[in-house]
Swiss-Prot record:
UniProt name for this protein: Urease
Organism: Aspergillus fumigatus (strain ATCC MYA-4609 / CBS 101355 / FGSC A1100 / Af293) (Neosartorya fumigata)
Modified residues (N6-carboxylysine): 490
Pathway assigned to this chain's UniProt record: Nitrogen metabolism; urea degradation; CO(2) and NH(3) from urea (urease route): step 1/1
Entry cofactors: Ni cation
Record-linked Pfam families: Amidohydro_1 (PF01979), Urease_alpha (PF00449), Urease_beta (PF00699), Urease_gamma (PF00547)
Positions with a binding annotation for substrate: 492
Family: In the C-terminal section; belongs to the metallo-dependent hydrolases superfamily. Urease alpha subunit family.
Keyword Hydrolase carried by entry: yes
Cysteine pairings via disulfide bonds: none
EC number(s) from the headed UniProt entry: 3.5.1.5
Binding site for Ni(2+) 2: 490, 519, 545
A molecular function GO annotation: urease activity
Keyword terms, alphabetized: Hydrolase, Metal-binding, Nickel
């Protein structure tokens, strides 16, 4: 067949395109991926037919699917589609703008080449206009109404008459020093000294040959130093240099047409203002604007904007981040950022706000206003953009900290790609691959296996911490594992979570400052939950799947959320409670824990762990902030690529059933609830595991492990994932494409994934002090966990509630502070079939 990679890549389009045709033919409304694949696949077939031009196909692509054939969200998200194929004249790009542009489309064209029967017209419902209201669209932005934003507020302005005597068009950008513009522009250059156009940052004014325009100029800000351009007026703005500058203009042949001194006060010249909606489209939402998170019922309101109106950073042709404009000149790399993320909406436990994010040496070096302090207002001294700075456009994007999954069974290395594609950048757990022990427990036992697993994970583009086996009432083996590099210890009932083992394990954790995680005794063999809690002796411990379906004292392990030394987490199969939750769990549990349906006691053990009442209560306790963390239990009763989306589905369900939180009442937004839920998979696991000094939040001094989202796909599929400020995974098109947006657009590993030092190997301090980990030949950055033992529930951000718990041992009814914790199972959730093909 002699195929090459670009041909194999296109097979994804054909496979999914034909799948989408089959679904369409049986009356299923298509989601974004299906609709994009169907149109792309048909275009490829029409290209192969050889009868159509690029222009023909650009038109045909808009006629295949109508609004009735796709889910309402697709009309908003599928605004452009690009394919490349081999025409009789070679490879060319076909761009289809607004592919869903009619109600009815053309099913004959949509099912082209499939030989499938065309379904009756009444198979698909008539589009309901209410489904397409702006506020119902995924990632909707609702700017503050009836307000305008003033650009470059408080600065001096002038008006100048400008005539173009050139024979070609001249376009001048917002931040180009106006005195330095094309010599064929005729105007009073001395009056323009120290000024630039008073227009939105990154826009421009175009002068066609012979044009005469009156433009408004505004003073440059910052240090007021001119650099770059034509080097006519370089240096600090100083009117005493006027004669010198005039002579240079004359020598260099720049047209200068003096104007009479203005009679009106420059303060009377109105500044440029922008409609809030137009501003949001260009630079992203700003203070007071509302943003919907995906298709959930959650809305955030921007709390503040650290950028400066009129001096925003914008990269591209004619934009602001150019030499001598938004990019400063004559500065060393030591003074400038390595990378800047511009105009990002940050969603973090620390706030929900708009800012530029500065990255240097793999760390978040500053958050605020970036740019060129020589001509821009409010530039943070640690956020200078220079010729050594790269740019990631964050406008109309959301940036969060990389997610942290603290419950990983290292069953297969391919988990990393799934997790990265969902926004997870840190794994903590144990195992040795698909061994029987690892299929059930997160333990890497013994120093040999510990070393081998640490070495095996060295090339994975994700932060990793390996947990040892803590089930040993004698401490010698546990100490060996810690000294071999264990970042924590796991107690699991399948290895025997007895009070004696718990006591010894916690002693060793206290001695070496590592965290203890526990899966308690479902059998109640050594005692009930009270005996296990007693064995903790008020020492800090992280309780896994605290509800109990994932394992733990039946039926009341959930009661441990009341204790100040317990750091409770959930695993995601029970998140949130739905009509299907109970039915999937029995078989899941039997496989995971090596049980047999032929042994009645095994079946009874499994059934004792699956209780609708406690799963429903888990929903409520998350919303109260009593369960502090979310994790997966990867391939061992959990899904490593769904920690984040199930967190937000839980938040959505709780808002739908329980209403706004008290803290959010009257705000018109859900900021408090959003901070509570994002903390569950970012900052709180980082605090619990002794890693929050470097990861877990979007804060200065932390590793630049960041996830960039389109608001419309928030919580499901990130646009890009950064590790130490370097892109490790991104939605990326055909590598042979003329541009990076050619279908199929797939989450793919990027260059950062091949730089091991962008990720951390978390180990114990003892393993570093003994020089053991250094002998492993690792390329990853080695860091010790710390401050694991003197923390408690009080340290869990937005999730520190400790209600007095009661669980009825017969009915399983759960009460918190005397209030019934009950929730109905969801019949549908937002972050599901609109986003995923399977």
């Amino acid at each position: 067949m002699h195929l090459i990679p670009k041909e194999l890549d296109k097979l994804v389009i054909s496979q999914l395109g034909f799948l989408a045709q089959r679904r369409l033919a049986r009356g299923v409304r298509l989601n974004h991926a299906e609709a994009a694949a169907l149109i792309s696949s048909n275009l490829q077939e029409l290209i192969r037919d050889g009868h159509y031009s690029v222009a023909d196909l650009m038109s045909i692509g808009k006629t295949m699917l109508g609004r009735r054939h796709v889910l309402p969200s697709v009309v908003h998200t599928l605004v452009e589609l690009q394919v490349e194929g081999t025409f009789p004249t070679g490879t060319y790009l076909v761009t289809v703008h607004h592919p869903i542009s009619s109600d009815d489309g053309d099913l004959e064209k949509a099912l082209y080449g499939s030989f499938l029967p065309i379904p009756p017209a009444d198979t698909f419902p008539d589009p309901n206009p209410d489904d397409y209201l702006p506020e119902k669209m995924p990632g909707a932005v609702l700017p503050v109404k009836n307000e305008r934003i003033t650009l470059n507020d408080g600065r001096k302005r002038i008006r100048l008459k400008v005539m173009s005597k050139g024979d070609r068009p001249i376009q001048v950008g917002s931040h180009y020093h106006f005195i330095e513009t094309n010599p064929q522009l005729h105007f009073d250059r001395l009056r323009a000294y120290g000024y630039r156009l008073d227009i939105p940052a990154g826009t421009s004014v175009r002068f066609e040959p012979g044009d005469t325009k009156t433009v408004t100029l505004v003073e440059i800000a910052g240090n007021r130093i001119i650099k770059g351009g034509n080097s006519i007026a370089s240096g600090k703005v100083d009117i005493s240099r006027a004669e010198e500058i005039l002579q240079r203009l004359q020598v260099e042949g720049f047209a200068h047409v003096p104007e009479p001194a203005p009679t009106a006060d420059s303060a009377l010249i109105a500044p440029f203002t922008m409609d809030r909606e137009a501003y949001a489209r260009m630079f992203g939402p700003t203070t007071g604007d509302l943003v919907r998170l995906g298709l959930t019922n959650l809305w955030v309101r921007v709390e503040k904007d650290c950028t400066v109106y009129g001096d925003e950073c914008a990269f591209g042709g004619g934009k602001t981040l150019r030499e001598g404009m938004g990019q400063s000149s004559e500065r060393s790399a030591t003074e400038c950022l390595d990378t800047v993320i511009t105009n990002a909406l940050i969603i973090d436990w620390s706030g929900i706000y708009k800012a530029d994010i500065g990255i240097k040496n793999g760390l978040i070096s500053a958050i605020g206003k970036a740019g060129n302090p020589d001509m821009m207002d409010g530039v943070h001294p640690d956020m200078i953009v220079g010729s050594s700075t790269d740019v990631i456009a964050g406008e109309n994007k959301i940036v969060t900290a990389g997610g942290f999954d603290t419950h990983i069974h290292f069953i297969c290395p391919q988990q990393v790609d799934e997790a990265l594609a969902s926004g997870i950048t840190t794994f903590l757990g144990g195992g040795t691959g698909p061994s029987t022990g690892t299929n059930a427990t997160t333990c890497t036992p013994g120093p040999t296996l510990m070393r081998q697993m640490i070495q095996a994970c060295d090339g994975l583009p994700i932060n990793v911490g390996i947990t040892g086996k803590g089930n040993d009432s004698g401490g010698k083996s546990i100490e060996e594992q810690i000294r071999a590099g264990a970042a924590g210890l796991k107690l699991h009932e399948d290895w025997g979570s007895t009070p004696a083992a718990i006591d010894t394990c916690l002693d060793m954790c206290d001695k070496f400052d590592v965290q203890c995680m526990i899966h308690t005794d479902t059998l109640n063999e050594s005692g009930f939950v009270e005996q296990t809690v007693k064995s903790f002796k008020n020492r800090t411990i992280h309780t896994y799947h605290t509800e109990g379906a994932g394992g733990g004292h039946a039926p009341d392990i959930i009661s441990v959320v009341e204790h100040p030394n317990v750091l409770p987490s959930s695993t995601n199969p029970t998140r949130p409670f739905t009509m299907n939750t109970l039915d999937e769990h029995l078989d899941m549990l039997m496989v995971c824990h090596h049980l047999s349906k032929n042994i009645p006691e095994d079946v009874a053990f499994a059934e004792s762990r699956i209780r609708a009442e406690t799963i429903a209560a888990e929903d409520v306790l998350h919303d109260l902030g009593a369960i502090s963390m979310m994790s997966s239990d990867s391939q061992a009763m959990g899904r490593c690529g769904e920690v984040i989306l199930r967190t937000w589905n839980t938040a959505h369900k709780n808002k739908a059933q329980r209403g706004p939180l008290k803290e959010d009442e009257g705000t018109g937004a859900d900021n408090f609830r959003v901070k509570r839920y994002i903390s569950k998979y970012t900052i709180n696991p980082a605090i619990a595991q002794g890693m929050s000094h470097l990861i877990g939040s979007v804060e200065v001094g932390k590793l630049a492990d960041l996830v960039i989202w389109h608001p419309s796909t928030f919580g499901t599929k990130p646009a890009q994932v950064l590790k130490s400020g370097m892109i490790v995974a991104s939605q990326m098109g055909d590598p042979n494409g003329s541009i990076p947006t050619i279908e199929p657009v797939v989450m793919r590993r990027q260059f950062g994934a091949f730089v091991p030092s962008t990720s951390i190997m978390w180990v114990s301090q003892a393993s570093i002090d003994d020089g053991i980990v250094q002998s492993y030949g690792l390329k990853k950055r080695i860091e010790a966990v710390r401050n694991c033992r003197n923390i408690g529930k009080k340290d869990m951000k937005f999730n520190d509630v400790m209600p007095k718990m009661r669980v009825d041992p017969e009915s399983y009814v759960v009460e918190a502070d005397g209030v019934l914790c009950d929730a109905e199972p969801a019949e549908a959730l937002p972050l599901t079939q609109d986003y995923f093909v399977y």
